[in-house]
Amino acid sequence: MPVQNMTGESPLERQVWLYRELYGLPCRASGPRITLSTSDVSAINAPSGLAALIDDELFWSKKVTPILDEGTGSGDLILLAAPSPLDMSCCAADLRRRARFEFLPPGRQIALPSTLPPPGPEPHWFRYPQSERLQPITAVLRAIRIVLRDIPRTYPA
């Protein structure tokens, strides 16, 4: 039986509630993990150095969005954005070619940090969703374009 607090909910249920209600992340409990499906959000895998610069750009434009480190040691971070009906295939090919960005395909399950230690790699927030909500994918793409324009010598095409 899961541990429950005074309100009758488990710490995992409480964390899911925080992610869903306060931060707008459409996640769910899946065993000991909290997962988020890329069918419900737009997710872009980016090299950590570029993701940090994109985070700075989003911060200065007041469009902060959650950024996740899956804890796999790959050196990549996942930028989360609101889902979009736009076709990103043209944009995705250009970003993959220029700077190793990858739009994660629909249906992939992403593990979010939770109160229970998960089996395997432990995800953690690079940018914790404190008051920020998922930003539109267009805001994230705008920040990516600005960063790539400003540092072409660091990440050549």
Residue ranges, per PLM feature:
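DNA replication initiation modules
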Residues: D87-A157
